Amino acid sequence: MVSLEKNDHLMLARQLPLKSVALILAGGRGTRLKDLTNKRAKPAVHFGGKFRIIDFALSNCINSGIRRMGVITQYQSHTLVQHIQRGWSFFNEEMNEFVDLLPAQQRMKGENWYRGTADAVTQNLDIIRRYKAEYVVILAGDHIYKQDYSRMLIDHVEKGARCTVACMPVPIEEASAFGVMAVDENDKIIEFVEKPANPPSMPNDPSKSLASMGIYVFDADYLYELLEEDDRDENSSHDFGKDLIPKITEAGLAYAHPFPLSCVQSDPDAEPYWRDVGTLKAYWKANLDLASVVPELDMYDRNWPIRTYNESLPPAKFVQDRSGSHGMTLNSLVSGGCVISGSVVVQSVLFSRVRVNSFCNIDSAVLLPEVWVGRSCRLRRCVIDRACVIPEGMVIGENAEEDARRFYRSEEGIVLVTREMLRKLGHKQER
């Protein structure tokens, strides 16, 4: 383990990102989000009033000083590709800055799409090697968080690791959804199990397990060697968590990086924020959390901006209807192009170009772009997919049986509404 002085840290914080390339795994469908991902990959799902989920990983790279990125796509990639082309095309290729789109290509070697997360990188090795990076940062494109990857790179170099895995404690009852690890006093990973049925607890806290966040730093040459070896293994599932990380752990070359060391927060005393919005409830709740008085995730931090494609839109407008009732909102996010006419919006998130007509009550709802809500509607505890036309007088979120019959209703009572569901009920979706 190498001990570094403060000046060395500052120098490495500038140099290491320039020697790195980030690969963002963005090909997943996200089946637990149900119909919300029928026509888009999970990283392309809207979030936080104006963003897409992938914007967080991309923004973290830019803010960390990493200016070379590859986005690996597969499932329903058109929306994602379009978003990146529109919103992330400001790089200067002459300065060796870029976002490369790396779709599944079914190369001549075989007819397989990506067989796993590791295989997604393997199938693009010929392209990735051209980047001539010393370090490769592997990221999931479907998580919400703010992290300074330069701090993780420094930790990787300081510990003399060949592979570093970002980790954080999670409640033990949720740990079966993650890779779970045990570490020694130097953060060397001594055991790693992917999605165990009975996850081991942390020695100092039996209520929690130490979980992998799916964020990795590799020495580039070591990663390429591992991937080529894994590609030849017919018994491998070609997945980082299931195959590569356990193998590296056995070799004694994997180290853990505690997420609090690189989590970017405005309040240093706050709990580190990282969310996998992979279920409808988690997605709904994470959106509504941003509308709270003091949200856990600070979206207004000028030192760590979240970038996205910014469409030219007029400001949101709140107007009275013909009867004189005023449009108003409380504890909500309302994006550009929205018009709220004589209705009440409480604890909700309205994306761009949403129109709420008179006499409506919107409570704890997430309305994606271009939703049109007819007069006298009541929407509660729901997610309304893009461009839905909610007919006059419709009530959602008040009658569990009625909601389950018409739409998708989660076990926690969150209702998902899509254009296809409304069409099946006989409601026209064209205006």
From Swiss-Prot:
GO biological process, one term: glycogen biosynthetic process
Quaternary data: Homotetramer.
Family the UniProt entry places it in: Belongs to the bacterial/plant glucose-1-phosphate adenylyltransferase family.
S-S bridge residues: none
PANTHER family: GLUCOSE-1-PHOSPHATE ADENYLYLTRANSFERASE, GLUCOSE-1-PHOSPHATE ADENYLYLTRANSFERASE-RELATED
EC class (word): transferase
Coiled-coil spans in chain: none
Gene source species: Shigella boydii serotype 18 (strain CDC 3083-94 / BS512)
Annotated function: Involved in the biosynthesis of ADP-glucose, a building block required for the elongation reactions to produce glycogen. Catalyzes the reaction between ATP and alpha-D-glucose 1-phosphate (G1P) to produce pyrophosphate and ADP-Glc.
Enzyme Commission number(s) from the entry: 2.7.7.27
Protein's UniProt name: Glucose-1-phosphate adenylyltransferase
Regulation: Allosterically activated by fructose-1,6-bisphosphate (F16BP) and inhibited by AMP.
Residues annotated as binding alpha-D-glucose 1-phosphate: 114, 179, 194-195, 212
Amino-acid positions noted as binding beta-D-fructose 1,6-bisphosphate in the UniProt annotation, renumbered to this chain: 39, 419-423, 429-431
Residues with site note (Could play a key role in the communication between the regulatory and the substrate sites): 74, 113
